UniProtKB/Swiss-Prot annotation:
Phylogenetic placement of the source organism: Bacteria, Bacillati, Bacillota, Bacilli, Bacillales
Quaternary organization: May form a heterooligomeric complex that consists of seven subunits: mnhA2, mnhB2, mnhC2, mnhD2, mnhE2, mnhF2 and mnhG2.
Chief location: membrane
Residues annotated as transmembrane: 11-31, 51-71, 72-92
Role: Expression of the mnh2 operon in E.coli is not able to catalyze Na(+)Li(+)/H(+) antiport. It does however confer higher growth rates than the control strain at up to pH 9.5. The operon may encode an NADH-ubiquinone oxidoreductase.
Name this polypeptide is given: Putative antiporter subunit mnhG2
Pfam families reported for this sequence: PhaG_MnhG_YufB (PF03334)
Keywords, in A-Z order: Antiport, Cell membrane, Ion transport, Membrane, Transmembrane, Transmembrane helix, Transport
Protein family membership: Belongs to the CPA3 antiporters (TC 2.A.63) subunit G family.
Membrane topology recorded in Swiss-Prot or TrEMBL: Multi-pass membrane protein
Species: Staphylococcus aureus
GO molecular function: sodium:proton antiporter activity
């Protein structure tokens, strides 16, 4: 029985360390990426996974070592994993609608009017096109008011 307790404690410790490592990678990604969309992707995907691993590790630790099952911990695990992606989706959507900068790796998509170009002339044209599309969307959206 004692060896099983030690194995589960080791599994809980590994999950805590793995969750901490993924959170560190998420923090590096938030600092390293260039625009709000890439940063939100790094923040949401990896932080959700890191919180999941960390809370499962804590849950296993408490069940094995103290015999205590926390419903609050389980509810927080479910709540964070449901609300974090939805919240970041809304932030990215608001940034897109307000015309936030979109990073471009290369000029492979020059036909796309939404993407920003590296030179100033195409960049201002792309910004004007995006502003026109936003205005059309607003008119269509608020037409019924």
């Amino acid at each position: 029985m004692e060896i099983t307790k030690e194995i589960f404690s080791l599994i809980a410790a590994v999950m805590l360390l793995l969750g901490s490592f993924i959170a560190l990678i998420s923090a590096i990604g938030i600092v390293k990426f260039q625009d709000v969309f890439l940063r939100s992707h790094a923040a949401t995907k990896s932080s959700t996974l890191s919180v999941l691993l960390t809370l499962i590790g804590v849950l296993i630790y408490f069940i094995v070592n103290t015999g205590f099952f926390s419903v609050r911990l389980l509810l927080s695990l479910v709540f964070i994993n449901l609300t974090s992606p939805v919240g970041m989706h809304l932030v990215a959507r608001a940034a897109y609608r307000n015309g936030a900068y979109m990073y471009r790796k290369n000029d492979a998509h020059t036909h796309a009017s939404i993407l920003l170009s590296s030179n100033e002339q195409n960049s201002t044209e792309a910004l004007q096109l995006r502003a026109e599309k936003r205005e059309e969307h607003r008119k269509k959206w608020y037409q019924n008011d």
